């Protein structure tokens, strides 16, 4: 992404360099980086943020000669307990969906009176144990930011 500061002080961002700008009609997007800088176009730095953070309003960094988004901490309206409960609910849904993939095996074996393969039973037990471990970890978080930043597993 690239941006420029307009005469009125506002910063305009572009996903790609415009083809025309000012007195350059066509080919503006082919100018070199240093040529673009003469027109006030500089790179935009977008930092990687955590769930507990958000990007602030884009600003010019004189020090680095780039436009950047400052990182700000999010304010959470839920209580710590509510955030934990919500995160745990999502966790259980994720693990429930993974366990559900083998439910048909359990049901089939029960209906037919077969013994379920130990690999299936072990895998299901491991999922339940892992879910309980992660639930304990979530409950151990002491700040809203730590709960928000706790990454849930993905089985995709």
Regions found by a protein language model. Give the residues of each.
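A preference for well-ordered globular domain cores
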Residues: 1-156
């Amino acid at each position: 992404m690239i941006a420029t500061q307009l005469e009125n002080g506002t910063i305009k961002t572009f996903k790609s360099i415009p083809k025309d700008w000012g007195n350059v009609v066509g080919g503006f997007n082919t100018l070199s980086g240093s040529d673009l800088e003469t027109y006030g176009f500089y790179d935009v730095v977008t930092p990687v943020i955590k769930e507990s953070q958000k990007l602030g309003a884009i600003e010019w960094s004189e020090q680095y000669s780039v436009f950047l988004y400052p990182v700000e901490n999010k304010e959470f309206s839920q209580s710590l307990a509510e955030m934990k409960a919500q995160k745990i609910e999502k966790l259980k849904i994720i693990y429930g969906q993974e366990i559900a993939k083998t439910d048909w095996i359990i049901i089939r074996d029960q209906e037919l009176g077969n013994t379920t393969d130990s690999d299936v039973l072990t895998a299901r037990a491991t999922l339940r144990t892992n879910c309980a471990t992660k639930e304990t970890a979530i409950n151990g978080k002491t700040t809203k930011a730590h709960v928000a930043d706790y990454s849930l597993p993905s089985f995709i």
